[in-house]
C-alpha cells in the first residue's frame, strides 16, 4: 500500500464497495480513522463494536476474555487479540447467533496459519505471528511477550514490516528502540530494514535463509520464542529450524 495513506485508501475502497452493493461494514468504533470514514459514507450500513466492558487476561498460555458474566477461553496468544474477539461477537450478534454459540465458536477456534499460533516443539516453544506485521501489531506483540510469565528464557525473531513507504526506516528504528526498552536480550533481526535499524545492536540477517544457515551452526534450545514479521519474509522456514 506504500504507507498509511495507502492503507486508508484501500479500506476506503472496501467501504465504497459495500456501500454500492448494499453490504454491511463491521468496524471498531475505537478507531478514529475508521469512524470518520464510515461517517462520510451516508447510507452505508455499519455496525460498530468496541472492547468497552471487556477485560483480557492470560490464563495458562492463552487469552481469556471476560465480558460481564461471560468468560471466553480462547486459543489465541496475547491480550491485543481482544479486539478480534469483540469483532467476532459483533458479527455473530448481528446475524442473530445465540451468545452461547458465539462463545463456543470462538473457544473452538485454533489458529493454524501462523497468526497468534503457539507451537511446542522438541527444542523450543514458538509463538508464531508471521503472517502479517505492522508497527502497531508488532509493538503490541512485543509488549505482551515481554510481560508473559515463562520458565524458559525468551528470544525474539523479527522480520521486516512491509508497505510502510516513507515511514519504513523510522518505524523499524522505533521497534529496535522498543526492544531495548523491554529488555529482551536475545534478538534476531531479518531483512534489510531491520538490519539497518539494528546495526551493531542485535544480530541481523539479510533474509530467512541466512538466519537458517546461522541456526544450523548455532542451534537454539529451551527458549520461548516470538516469531513475527511480514509474510514476504518467509519466517515460517525459520520456525522449522527452531
Residue ranges and their predicted role:
Residues 1-125, 151, 177-180, 185-186, ...:
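Acidic, Mg2+-coordinating active-site environments of NTP-dependent enzymes
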Residues 34-35, 212, 235-236:
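Short, well-ordered alpha-helical microsegments
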Residues 87, 220-228:
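Short SAM/SAH-binding signature in class I
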Residues 49, 202-214:
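Short acidic-hydrophobic, aromatic-tinged amphipathic segments that line or gate anion-handling sites
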Residues 113-117, 232, 236-240:
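ATP-dependent carboxylate/acyl-activation modules
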Residues 1-4, 85, 138-139, 168-173, ...:
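Conserved strand-to-helix beginnings and helix N-cap segments that scaffold or border functional pockets
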Residues 111-114, 130-203, 230:
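Active-site beta-alpha connecting loops in nucleotide-dependent enzymes
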Residues 24, 125-128, 155-156, 224:
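Hydrophobic "anchor" residues on beta-strands that sit immediately upstream
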